[in-house]
Each structure stands twice: as structure tokens, then as C-alpha cells.
Amino acid sequence: MYTPIPQSGSPFPASVQDPGLHIWRVEKLKPVPIARESHGIFFSGDSYLVLHNGPEEASHLHLWIGQQSSRDEQGACAVLAVHLNTLLGERPVQHREVQGNESDLFMSYFPRGLKYYREGGVESAFHKTTSGARGAAIRKLYQVKGKKNIRATERPLSWDSFNTGDCFILDLGQNIFAWCGGKSNILERNKARDLALAIRDSERQGKAQVEIITDGEEPAEMIQVLGPKPALKEGNPEEDITADQTRPNAQAAALYKVSDATGQMNLTKVADSSPFASELLIPDDCFVLDNGLCAQIYIWKGRKANEKERQAALQVADGFISRMRYSPNTQVEILPQGRESPIFKQFFKNWK
């Protein structure tokens, strides 16, 4: 059990201190808890908070941003993250996760992979898919990508969405088909099967029929839903590499000091390239470690830095990404002093 924290006026329950995984969807600027059986299901139109409390009070707080989520929703998610982080005594390492570019740590919470819905919000298809009474009316198609980090993304219900190099899941409610392209490999096929079984168990209470389909042996029910099967395009192997890649640790990183002495957040470069001297990290300040060319930005928060600087860490990261014209998919990791990751430490030549 984590150290009790005052809950006065908090939108989060006292259980946020419990070990394990906690997930909230941002809904009308409030956090709405996600039931355990729905963990791993994300809507592209929404933003989420994912908190993992591990042993020895080692917490990680992830902000998951859907590709179609609004700026208002993303802003509300950031505000709630600041509140939750403060509630937990600023212990968590914070991460910004963008749909389709999640970190390996985030993916490790969901061993059966992630499933993305195109729709989002309270009135979305989420309620339809969890309702057994409407199970027969469900018609959804998912493309399964990645050999290590599995992501299932909802696609238009058409043969045009298929290719011969990937696996797809056609969810018809009472029947779930895992279709495997002729050029997909055995690992991908096994992952597609596992994901189809996970849909059956979590969304149909184990009562749907799962069938593995080989390219060219489509049953009549698939043809009835999708129409006559045309010649299919080939897959793109680069997409699997992107889904599975672990971003390299570039040596050409830079280090910036964050200051609000003028009333605004300003950045001053203190080192042009790594490895850096660890003495550059002063406990009274916050710093940006720029590894943006490898799609990664780190914010280090000194334990004596003022509250405004610490709480603005995510805002500083977003502004830095825009200023440097980095990809919006750039991952952000916010590290309190004393919670530095091994990857972060590799940028320093004399870490103690």
C-alpha cells in the first residue's frame, strides 16, 4: 500500500495509491475509470491516463493521446496528470504516449496487445461491443501489426483494408474470424489468434466463436459481409518494423536548463552534445534533454526546483517539440530526481 495522501477535493479515489494498473478516460474534463476487463482497449478520439504502481513505490504515469482526440481533451488530460502526480507526491515518472508510437514500457502492461477503436467518447461503439444483447449487430475489422508489440487498429469494413502480409480480425459479434494473409508469418498468426480470443473473453464473456482463416479459404459469412474477394495488395514490412522498433540512443543530444525567472518558461542550452557531465543537473532547476532526432525528449525535475517549473514540465516538453519542429509522435519522459531511467543515465559520462 502506498503512503496515504489527502484526498480533499480530488477527482481521483484513494485507490490510486494501490499497487497495480489504473486507467481513466478523460470525459467532459473528468477522469472516468476503465474496468479491468476493458484494459487494452483505447478509442482514437479520446485521451487517457494510465498509472502503474509497482514495487517500492515505483510509479509510472502515462498520458495516452488518441490520434483523433481534441486539443481541449489533451489539455484536460495534462491538467489531470499534474493533479494526480501531485496527489502521489510527485513520485511517478511521467510519459506522453501517442497512439501507434507507445513505449515498450507502456506495451508491457498489455501482454495481449492494444486494440484501437476509431470512434470515441461516451456515446461511442464501446457500449455496443460490450453488450451481449447487441452482439449479433457488431461488424468491425482490425488490422494486426507488429511481431513483438501488438497493436490492432480498426479499419474500414472492406476488402480494400486487407493485404497479404498482415493478419486481420473480423469481429461479427457471435463469430470472430482471425484472417491470416498468405505472406504473414507464424508469430503474427499466433498473435492474431490470441487477440481474437482476448476479444471473445473480454467483450463477449467467452461466448463468441473464434475461427482462424487462411488466405483463400474464407467462409461464406465473410464473403457475405465483405462482398466478393478481389486480388489483395501486398503488405508493407516497414510498418511492422515501426511498430516494433526501440528508438536508438543518439549521441548527438543536447541539454537545456529551464527557468521561469522572467515570469515565462525560458530554455538555455548548457551542453551541445552528449555524453554530459552529471554535475550539470542542478537540484534547484529543471532540464530538457533533447534526443528529438530519435523521437525522445526527457524532462529532469530537480527536487529543489520551484513548483511552477515542476508542474509545467509537460507543457515545456510540448512547446519544445513544436519549437524544434519534431514529429508530434515524439515520446516524452518526465523524470523526478532520483527516478532516472538507465537509458537517461547513458547520456552522462560520469553518472553517480
UniProtKB/Swiss-Prot annotation:
Residues carrying Phosphoserine: S341
Gene Ontology molecular function: any one: actin filament binding
Ranges: Gelsolin-like repeats: 27-75, 150-190, 265-311
InterPro entries found in the cross-reference section: ADF-H/Gelsolin-like_dom_sf, Gelsolin-like_dom, Villin/Gelsolin
Tissues in which the UniProt entry reports expression: Present in a large variety of tissues and is particularly abundant in kidney and lung. Highly expressed in macrophages (at protein level).
Source domain of life: Eukaryota
Any one annotated GO CC term: nucleus
GO BP terms: actin filament capping; cell projection assembly; cellular response to type II interferon
Pfam families: Gelsolin (PF00626)
Keyword set, alphabetical order: Acetylation, Actin capping, Actin-binding, Cell projection, Cytoplasm, Nucleus, Phosphoprotein, Repeat
Family: Belongs to the villin/gelsolin family.
Quaternary structure annotation from Swiss-Prot or TrEMBL: Interacts with NUP62. Interacts with NUTF2 and RAN; involved in CAPG nuclear import.
Name of protein: Macrophage-capping protein
Organism of derivation: Mus musculus (Mouse)
UniProt gene name: Capg
